[in-house]
Swiss-Prot record:
GO terms for biological process: defense response. Keywords: Plant defense. Induction: Up-regulated by the GmPep890 peptide and methyl salicylate. No induction by methyl jasmonate. This is Protein PROPEP890. The lineage of its organism: Eukaryota, Viridiplantae, Streptophyta, Embryophyta, Tracheophyta. It comes from Glycine max (Soybean).
Amino acid sequence: MVSCFDFFLSLNFGKMAKRFVWRTDKPQADLPQTPNSQVRIVSRDLPRGGNY
């Protein structure tokens, strides 16, 4: 019974992880369409590039 419960939990976690990845991937794909987010990406990446 415990193994069935663990299997169910792992299935639920897989679904949640898939949904989370899909949620995070979609906005990133939509980002270049809006100029504001593009500027934000550049400003966010500049310090990282300076550190390297």
